Design a protein with these regions (language model features):
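Tandem repeat scaffolds
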Residues: 1-196
Length: 196
């Protein structure tokens, strides 16, 4: 699909596989007429320079999909997942996003383990109870995020800007940060870092 417009579309429970969307619009600029993807499956799909702002992505599966330079502001993505089950005991996770704006979006309870986000904007978003284990949020804007009960073990945060990750309330075991980010984490501990 190239330069297509999907307004007021109900794609709930729809299935797409290896589908490409280039410069497509799924809502109006004021976030009205947003498309519904609730419970849909988009497996190994590519969205490039698309606008999904205001769309409902709740409980949808995006395994192996890729977002490139998309606008996805204020999306409702509670229960969003990048993980498909190969069998009863074997999950497989994959999702990538580059230079995509997810600001003001709600990813509560999302399963984003092993997802790779690079240079994305999540500012003022909600990642409460989201599973980000072994994921990467490199060079992302993570300012003013709600992290309550999020799983962050082994998360790669190198180059990201954040101000609400509290090491007293979140398990940061094996989280990867750069030396310049130590000060961002130490603020919640009352430490003053001085570089000589």
């Amino acid at each position: 699909f190239i330069n297509c417009t999907f307004l007021n579309c109900n794609l709930a429970s729809a299935e797409f596989s290896e589908t490409r969307f280039d410069q497509c619009r799924f809502s109006e600029p004021d976030l009205s007429a947003a498309t519904i993807f609730r419970f849909s499956k988009l497996v190994q799909c590519t969205l490039q320079e698309c606008d999904l702002s205001g769309c409902d992505l709740s409980s949808s599966l995006w395994f192996g999909s890729h977002f490139e330079r998309c606008r996805a502001r204020a999306v409702k993505a509670t229960g969003f997942s990048s993980t498909k089950m190969i069998n009863e005991h074997l999950p497989l996770s994959e999702l990538t996003a580059n230079q995509t704006d997810f600001s003001f979006s709600d990813f509560s309870g999302a399963n984003l383990s092993y997802a790779n986000f690079s240079d994305c904007n999540f500012e003022n978003g909600i990642l409460a109870a989201a599973n980000l284990q072994c994921a990467a949020l490199t060079d992302c804007n993570l300012l003013d995020i709600e992290w309550h009960d999020a799983v962050l073990r082994e998360l790669d945060l190198r180059g990201a800007m954040f101000n609400t990750i509290n090491p007293k309330t979140l398990d940061l075991k094996d989280v990867v940060i750069s030396p310049l980010q130590v000060e961002m984490l130490s603020e919640h501990l009352g430490l003053i870092i001085q570089f000589d």
